[in-house]
């Protein structure tokens, strides 16, 4: 049996919202053992928007640096400097996969 793959998502714009919708509809989770463990977004979201009460929500992406309960970081903030660069490099230093 495969271990559960834990995902952290940084940035909930158009693409990030679409990823969340896919998870809420369970279209991905039916075929893969995947769990979203964290979301970082400046956008105000309600727990019901996330599809699960067990997802850690950060309104500051920099707080993902102190969070370790994920295997893959999905970085959707964009840009090659600033916070997006910082969280990607932090994840790579921790041995995490980054998309």
Cite the ranges covered by each PLM segment.
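Hydrophobic Val/Ile/Leu positions in short beta-strands of Rossmann-like dinucleotide-binding domains
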Residues: 7-9
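N-terminal Rossmann-fold NAD(P) dinucleotide-binding loop
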Residues: 16-17
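NAD(P)-binding Rossmann-fold cofactor-contacting core
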Residues: 25-50
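Glycine-rich Rossmann-fold phosphate-binding loop(s) that bind the pyrophosphate
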Residues: 12
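A structured beta-alpha segment of the ubiquitous adenosine-cofactor-binding alpha/beta core
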Residues: 55-72, 77-80
